[in-house]
Amino acid sequence: MRVLEGLQPAAALGFFETLCAIPHGSRDTKAISDYCVRFAQERGLSWQQDASNNVIIRKPASPGYEDHPTVILQGHLDMVCEKNADCDIDFSKDGLRLRHDDTYIFADGTTLGGDDGIAVAYALAVLDSSELKHPPLEAVFTVDEEIGMLGAAALDMSGLQGRVLLNIDSEDEGILTVSCAGGATSCLTVPVKRVPVQGKAWRVGVRGLTGGHSGVEINKGRANANKVLAAALQGLPVTLCSIAGGSKDNAIPRASEAVVVSEADDLAALFAANAAKAALPETEQHAEFYCEPAGAGEMLAGSEAVLGLLNAVPNGVQAMSGDIPGLVQTSLNLGILTTDADAVRLTFSVRSSVNREKFGLIDQLKALAARFGGSYSESGEYPAWEYQKDSRLREVMVEVFEAQYGRKPVVEAIHAGLECGIFSDRLPGLDAVSFGPQMHDIHTSRERLDIASTARTWEYLVAVLERL
């Protein structure tokens, strides 16, 4: 007997259990991709599979819907593989050990992969049904979303007919996501030369800041340790030996430290006075500045340019949305500051839900790098999914939601990247919405999928397709 037998929606959860038996971590998607191809072959549906393991399956419209616009059902095949220390599952060859109680489906000791296996399961159930009413369908299953949306980036979309996209990769029932940020990782490099130390060496820094995620928490008034330290050093008679802070471009750094050389006898007092002027937000009650003697053999010629650049670069929220209240529209975060043998590097996470603002901010960083004798490089650029003031899909999904739930859904945008951004960039005129059933603690071994929510969301999907 199958573990999920008897639960509703039966068809979708049956496919979900089958998918969970197939290893499908990021970069290990060949088997699950091949399963989707076999599914299509067995039902006489047209299909495509590319070298990245992305799969497209097409199904004709149900009777009476032949002249309706094609709808894309989209989700990703890969999952995040995390497990408890005492769990002996080998994600490369073992399926998940599904369990459920009256409320949730979960896996024993591992992530569940509801993100985004339930999307694939919903789509397969729609493709398998001969009873549902729907327009022509293109089910698009991408790979390696969890490690940078690599599958969507590699997908040839030139053959896609659909310009209406249902992305089922959200984890909060009742929320319709209609826009996301685009972004890039920007690196500013300032060359330096090492010369013998002249003066006394000190270790100075700031620690104990709150930190946080630069997408979700950039608007919560949290100080960036790299910017705080640069401000505390501004105007002091110091030469850098090294400076470093943060380890991820998308995390607001909590601590930053420099080794400096100074001929001033009272540098500790001067640094303390500068630090006292730091306009730290009220959220930073545990910030601690320090200045203590250190050892150093070399200092950096050219450190004036480094400190000048650090104090000149923008950071944090740059613009708020005029369409969606409370949404950060454009921001950047100086997440990583490092000193190498011949250069100091500033690494930023740049985000904006308006593509022209993202590129404008990048141009500003390029100009500042050049002004201070540095260079600019970039990686991981991805497009924004811009908010559409007029969206028939959004209107239909709001109406169907109100009819089913008796209340309005929350319509929101997020200050982070989604595959919808790549699809909207490649498919002109795309009308897209992201939604999904309720999940908790995704990407952890505590991940669980709400059974009742999964049933409601299935009913919602079916009703939306009938209206499109």
Residue ranges and their predicted role:
Residues 327-416:
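Substrate-recognition/cap regions that form aromatic- and gly/pro-loop-enriched pockets
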Residues 77-79, 140-148, 169-173, 210, ...:
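Acidic, glycine-rich active-site loops and adjacent beta-strand->loop/helix elements
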Residues 222-244, 387-430:
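Active-site-adjacent substrate-binding region
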